C-alpha cells in the first residue's frame, strides 16, 4: 500500500492514502461477491462450504476404492466439458483441480513405487515379469485411478491434462454417459470379474526406463564433450595430463 504526504494545509494528519490505493479499496468490495460465487439464500460464504467441504472429506477418508469413487461421483455434476465457462463459474475450482491433481499423482506414484520395491530390484533392471504386473493390477488403487482417468478424460479435460500418471494408466472397462435430462454424468462400471489390461502397465514401465536411460545418457555425453572441449575443466577435478615438451639442442 502506497502512502503520500498530506501537504501543508492539514496539520492534523501527516499521511494519507494515495489515489491508486483508494481505487483498490473501492473496487475490492464490488469484486468480492464474484470471487465468492453466486448469491444464495445462505449468503456468499455458503459457496466456500459446499465447494471445499467434499474435498477435505475426501482427503480424510481412507484411501480405498469405494470411498473415493463415492466422493467423486458426487462431484461429477460440477464438471463440464467447457473449461473456460467452468473456470468463470467457479474461480477457485481450477486452483483446487491443480492442487488435487498433484496430490493424486504423488499418491499413486508412491503406491506403485512401493509395490515395485517389494517385488524386487530385478523388476527395474530387466523386463517386468507377469507376477509383478499381476500384483500391480490387483490393487484397488489401480482400478480407482483407471476410473478417475475415464471420468476426467471425458468431462474434465483441464484436470486430465495435468495428471501424467493417469494418462498412462489404462482407461478401461468404464463407460460414460451424459444424461441431458438430469444434467449429470452417469457411469457404467465393469463386472467384478474383469481385470485391467497388463499391456498398459508394461508400456508405462518401459517409458519410465527409457526416460531414465535417456537422461543419464545425455548427462554422460554432455560431460564427455565438455571434458574434451574445455581443457580447464580437467584441472577443476584435479586431473593434470602430462604434455610433451620439446628441448632445443
UniProtKB/Swiss-Prot annotation:
Organism of origin: Porcine reproductive and respiratory syndrome virus (strain Lelystad)
Subunit structure: Heterotrimer of GP2a, GP3, and GP4. The GP2a-GP3-GP4 complex associates with the E protein. Interacts with host CD163; this interaction plays a role in virus entry into host cell.
Cysteine disulfide links: none
Signal sequence extent: 1-35
Described function: Minor envelope protein. Along with GP4, serves as the viral attachment protein responsible for mediating interactions with CD163 thereby playing a role in virus entry into susceptible host cells.
Virion surface side: 36-207
Chief location: virion
Keyword Transmembrane helix belongs to the record: yes
One GO term describing the cellular component: host cell Golgi membrane
Lineage start: Viruses, Riboviria, Orthornavirae, Pisuviricota, Pisoniviricetes
Membrane topology: Single-pass type I membrane protein
Keywords: Glycoprotein, Host endoplasmic reticulum, Host Golgi apparatus, Host membrane, Host-virus interaction, Membrane, Secreted, Signal, Transmembrane, Transmembrane helix, Viral attachment to host cell, Viral envelope protein, Virion, Virus entry into host cell
Name this polypeptide is given: Glycoprotein 2a
Localization per record: Virion membrane; Host endoplasmic reticulum membrane; Host Golgi apparatus membrane; Secreted
Any Gene Ontology biological process: virion attachment to host cell
Amino acid at each position: 500500500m502506497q502512502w503520500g504526504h498530506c501537504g501543508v494545509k492539514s496539520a492534523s494528519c501527516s499521511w494519507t492514502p494515495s489515489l491508486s490505493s483508494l481505487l483498490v479499496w473501492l473496487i475490492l468490495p464490488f469484486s468480492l461477491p464474484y470471487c465468492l460465487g453466486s448469491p444464495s439464500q445462505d449468503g456468499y460464504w455458503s459457496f466456500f462450504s459446499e465447494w471445499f467441504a467434499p474435498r477435505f472429506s475426501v482427503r480424510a477418508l481412507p484411501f480405498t476404492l469405494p470411498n473415493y469413487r463415492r466422493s467423486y461421483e458426487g462431484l461429477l455434476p460440477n464438471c463440464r466439458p467447457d473449461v473456460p465457462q467452468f473456470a468463470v463459474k467457479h474461480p477457485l475450482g481450477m486452483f483446487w483441480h491443480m492442487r488435487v491433481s498433484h496430490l493424486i499423482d504423488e499418491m499413486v506414484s508412491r503406491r506403485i513405487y512401493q509395490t515395485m520395491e517389494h517385488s524386487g530390484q530385478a523388476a527395474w533392471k530387466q523386463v517386468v515379469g507377469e507376477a509383478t504386473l499381476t500384483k500391480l493390477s490387483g490393487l484397488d488403487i489401480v482400478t480407482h485411478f483407471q476410473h478417475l482417468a475415464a471420468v476426467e478424460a471425458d468431462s474434465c479435460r483441464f484436470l486430465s491434462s495435468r495428471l501424467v500418471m493417469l494418462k498412462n494408466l489404462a482407461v478401461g472397462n468404464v463407460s460414460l454417459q451424459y444424461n441431458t435430462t438430469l444434467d449429470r454424468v452417469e457411469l457404467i462400471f465393469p463386472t467384478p470379474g474383469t481385470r485391467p489390461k497388463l499391456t498398459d502397465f508394461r508400456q508405462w514401465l518401459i517409458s519410465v526406463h527409457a526416460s531414465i536411460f535417456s537422461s543419464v545418457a545425455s548427462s554422460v555425453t554432455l560431460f564427455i564433450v565438455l571434458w574434451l572441449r574445455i581443457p580447464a575443466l580437467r584441472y577443476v577435478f584435479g586431473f593434470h595430463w602430462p604434455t610433451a615438451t620439446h628441448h632445443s639442442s
